[in-house]
């Protein structure tokens, strides 16, 4: 029997991507994310996480993104990957429909041993976040004490993590290793070309993210946003770019360098919203499901995690009722509208 078609929401968007946060804790304190220092109570157990992913795959999910906080802080990461790999190898298991399991990390804990373990456990892709290369700017963007020296140490760790991931088999050429950077005017906009230079030298796709109004702690203001168009224009003036087709459901628009030295992408939730084909559901480490990054509250899945049948009915119904289009409707919301925090949602 063929699987039932994926549910569609009120705007006819299918369910395709599950973003699962493993922890809200982080070893950095980036001001745009504002992570918590203590673990959430009531975290999902490993068996519940696997059950959730299996149900999501039965509803059409083809991509799983593991997030945080900092997911490498979670002692459940490797056991989860191993359990998912076992399911993916069984054609009769809905987990076999997973085409990609990806991880987003700040790279600080991405040692050679950890990178090899992640690859062996079945992880397909790693995205490393790095917002600057100059020590003082890095310290500001990562919320570090110790100024320039602390920032320089962090850059060394993250670049070491990138190298470790590549040696472990996460290949940039096939999309297995990418670099993320959140750009904020007046803080790290001077780092745009240095980051692009680094990515070109290492053959890694650089994804440039507009500073977003997620959460209530980061003091977001529109004049702090560097638009994707401006970022592309500045890079194109240095190294000519060629636009690439946008894939359905993708968060990013992409360009290739005319000289063949790699690609960049932009995630422009502020200036070029992509709500129209958004196919993502976010579930926090404590089992709250959010149908939009900018939502103020979620749906508690924990009462339903004991049964795949019950959980499937709840998640299907949640998706079918979904109407979120916050980024497209942003101007109609008041400045005081509450949002869940980025570190809690997992980006």
Swiss-Prot record:
A GO molecular-function annotation: GTP binding
UniProt cofactor note: Binds 2 [4Fe-4S] clusters. Binds 1 [4Fe-4S] cluster coordinated with 3 cysteines and an exchangeable S-adenosyl-L-methionine and 1 [4Fe-4S] cluster coordinated with 3 cysteines and the GTP-derived substrate.
Binding positions ([4Fe-4S] cluster 1): 26, 30, 33
Cofactor(s) listed in the protein's UniProt record: [4Fe-4S] cluster
Record flagged with keyword Zinc: no
Protein name as it appears in the record: GTP 3',8-cyclase
Record EC number: 4.1.99.22
Binding site for GTP: 19, 65, 104, 178, 280-282
Residue ranges annotated for the Radical SAM core domain, each copy included: 12-242
SUPFAM superfamilies documented for this protein: Radical SAM enzymes
Regions annotated as coiled coil: none
Alphabetical list of HAMAP family matching this protein: MoaA_B
Role played: Catalyzes the cyclization of GTP to (8S)-3',8-cyclo-7,8-dihydroguanosine 5'-triphosphate.
Residue positions binding [4Fe-4S] cluster 2: 275, 278, 292
Catalytic activity: GTP + AH2 + S-adenosyl-L-methionine = (8S)-3',8-cyclo-7,8-dihydroguanosine 5'-triphosphate + 5'-deoxyadenosine + L-methionine + A + H(+)
NAD is among the record's keywords: no
Alphabetized InterPro entries for the sequence: Aldolase_TIM, MoaA, MoaA_twitch, MoCo_biosynth_MoaA/MoaC, rSAM
Pathway, per record: Cofactor biosynthesis; molybdopterin biosynthesis
Enzyme class of the recorded protein, top EC level: lyase
Residues that, per the record, bind S-adenosyl-L-methionine: 32, 69, 129, 212
Subunit structure: Monomer and homodimer.
BP-aspect Gene Ontology terms: Mo-molybdopterin cofactor biosynthetic process
Sequence similarity: Belongs to the radical SAM superfamily. MoaA family.
A matching Pfam family: Mob_synth_C
Keywords: 4Fe-4S, GTP-binding, Iron, Iron-sulfur, Lyase, Metal-binding, Molybdenum cofactor biosynthesis, Nucleotide-binding, S-adenosyl-L-methionine
